[in-house]
Structures are given as structure tokens and as C-alpha cells.
Amino acid sequence: ITQLRDGELAQIRNRHFGFIFQSYNLFPELTALENVMVPLMYAGRPRRERRERAEALLAQVGMAHRLKHLPTQLSGGEQQRVAIARALANNPTLLLADEPTGNLATDQGAEIMTLLQELNQQGTTVVIVTHDPAVSAYGRRLLRLRDGKIVSDGPLQEAALEA
């Protein structure tokens, strides 16, 4: 992998990785629908397929009614859900999520965590960084860090007992 060119690395990231950023990183000049379509465009998917996939993902995260809204017209929780839909656009094999429910209401957070659990059961590796014990309870394995070092690592039940 160290021998790959930047373009090749970008292709791997686009096709195999999904990123849910705590700060969303949505394009401010693009609508919710267009933001979710971006990774599909870079993957070379036809426009109609991009639109259909983006609409389906936005519906899945409860945002079908806000397709044409810009990020500035969305609440923090709505922006978070658009960012989650975008991260799932290319069916990543590895999903990296930084506080994916941090800006969501409790019920919406539970729905998103259930969705991430289902993706994991279907074969997607999901890595979540969180300070929220309720979110970590959805996991199968828990790594605890302190001062940048792993202080415990194991199945969720064992790691919870070590806390």
C-alpha cells in the first residue's frame, strides 16, 4: 500500500471505506441529496443510480423530507444523518465513525446504532469512537484508551467489567 499513488489510494478509500465525521464535513453549497451523491460520483456510478441510492439512504436515516436542503438549513442532528448516509453510499467494507450519534436525539441515536449493528452483521467492519457508554454497549468488542494508550481490550462484557 505504501507504493500506491495518491489516486490509487483515493480509489481504495472511496470504494472500501466509509467515514462518519463528528463535524459532518458536508459541502456547504450542496444539498443533502447532492452531498450523499458525491462518493457515488467519484466511484463512477451513473447519475440515475447515484440519485436512487442517495434517496434510499437518506430515507433510511429519516431524511427523505430534506433532500433539497443545504447544510445551513439543517439542524446538527439532520446534518449528522446526512453525513451517515454519505458514509454508507458505496457500501464500505470498513466504516469509521467518530461519535456518530453525538448530535442526535436519543431515539434517533438508537435507530442509527441499530442500522450500524445490522451493517456489521452483514459483514461491514464498524469502528466507533465514542465517550457514550450507551453507544459502546452496541459493540461486540471494546477497547478503552487512556492518554493515547490501550488500557483494556476484549469482548464487550469483559471490557465493561474492567472499567
Q: Model-derived features: where do they sit?
A:
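Conserved beta-strand-loop-alpha-helix hinge in the C-terminal portion
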Residues: 149-163
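ABC family nucleotide-binding domain
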Residues: 1-145
